[in-house]
Amino acid sequence: MITLYPKRLFKFPVDAECISPDVFAEKSSDEIGKLRIWEGNRKRSLSDVFKIKSETGSSSEEFTIKIRGDVSKVRKIGFKMSMGNIIVEGDAGMHLGEGMNGGVITVTGNADSWAGAKMKGGTIEVKGNVGDYIGASYRGSTQGMNGGKIIIHGNAGYEVGCFMMNGLIKVNGNVGRYAGVHMRNGTIFIQGNSEGRAGAQMINGKIVVCGHIPSILPTFTVDDIKPKVKVNGEKVEGPFYRFIGDLADKGKGKLFVSKTRNPQLNSYEKYLEYNI
């Protein structure tokens, strides 16, 4: 196991995609300390900004990196990692777990935007809140998250799962607008409230909103009322309105919205062939 301690509170962004079990495994502390990073526009060694403590005895698959301290300015932690564990005891910066294929990242605090962007496997768990574009594609790209799990215990920002292609995003708190925008497949499970416009331009996939949503986009049609919905093999008690869309994009995505928490949507029931 390797433990990293920030030597100071960072003023400028630190680009440290080398902080990954794939890179650290089989390296000595001295070799790890010589890995190159960027702090602002200056190239530095990892040991310039982190104190590095090494403990032997972990296999490659169980290799763990522990980061103790505020690394909210440190970007690309866990970049393209495929195995092992990263534990951040504090806040993490942007692009956490970008493109990861396996392994587990756990953050005890908050994480900034783009966490899990373009990830293909593995698990990211954030005990606090996250920023925007979780599990999303980058601007100009149509390749979002394509596997793995992202679990957020707090709230998430705008465009959760933008261009999502597969996998699971679970948010225990609330989300901003445009959750599941351009979604291709996969599941977004929101236990709290949504600020609205969920599923805009989605083609396929499943979005579940257990809390309040102000309104449904007019390009979605109500299809049914379901007593429960299945998320990642587990049944979530409803009842839920089931909407299909986005019809403007010939989409067949499913948007499940709590009936109990959204009495303002009762008018949709007249469009069903029968009332439940």
Predicted segments, located by residue:
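Right-handed parallel beta-helix/beta-solenoid
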Residues: A117-K118, G122, R139-S141
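Short, charge-rich binding segments
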Residues: G57-S59, I77-K80, E89, H95-G99, ...
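Long, hydrophobic, well-ordered secondary-structure blocks that form the structural core
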Residues: M100, V104-T106, T123
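Intrinsically disordered, low-complexity terminal regions
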Residues: M1-D70, K76, E125-K127, G140-H153, ...
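Extracellular beta-strand/beta-solenoid scaffold signature
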Residues: G131-S141
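LRR N-terminal entry segment and analogous cap-like coil->beta motifs
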Residues: G69, M83-G84, V88
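Tandem repeat scaffolds
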Residues: M81, G93, M100, D112, ...
